[in-house]
Amino acid sequence: HTLENQEKSDYLQAVKCLFESPAKTGIKEPSFLGTASSFVSTKSFSKRSADTLGSDEFSFGTNGVNTTQGTNCVIDGPFANTTLRMDQVYGIDYYDEYCLSREFNQTAFTFANQSYVDECYVKETYNEANFCYVDSPHSCGHLATGGTMENQNASPGDPIFFLHHANLDRLWWDWQLANLSSRLTDMSGQLIPPTFIMEQNRWLTPSAAYLDYDGDAGNDTTLNHVLWMAEIIPNKTIADVMDLRSELLCTEYIVAEK
């Protein structure tokens, strides 16, 4: 299915509406509701996405340029001259305003191409596939777009973030489909990354206030892990969202017509 221009416009206007709506959380809350976004926005994004990069009203805008507002600011498309206020360093309150920015990196684009996706597709376990997808398609999508997307804490400020993560969700579903009977229950991974990763990214170790409700007894992620939905909908578990065909998700990824 290929979206008509009106459908693209409707989607982009809906995103702008979210930008302009009052926040659901206070300034002291996390900058990004990761589980809510990946569960709600990501599951519907690829069905309603507009053309990715372009300067017209039906696209997401192009590369950034230097302006008086900042470096590499996006000045075309529906999100031209967007001002962001999300914290740029995890755990540190940030009250300054800055522009939505992009700085395309062609080398990173190369490392996110189909050949690297294919390498991940043949991995046998979730643990192997997860590390593979995170390493190339995921990280390089952020680095290739650059600017706001390159900053882990601020990256949800670029609407391309949700397009990118929707595609990752699609890739994961494609991987699951290759062996659905076992991969609908294949889950693993640490809840808290190794210390060197925490220090490298200047992340703070979560306190008991964040860990006492997650549903996992130790540091290993299980199907019982609770996904906090920020009161948008009732909290769910990973088990609830493993099957894209379920009544809860009821989602299908459709290949666009060429």
Residue spans for each PLM region:
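Intrinsically disordered, flexible peripheral segments
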Residues: 1-258
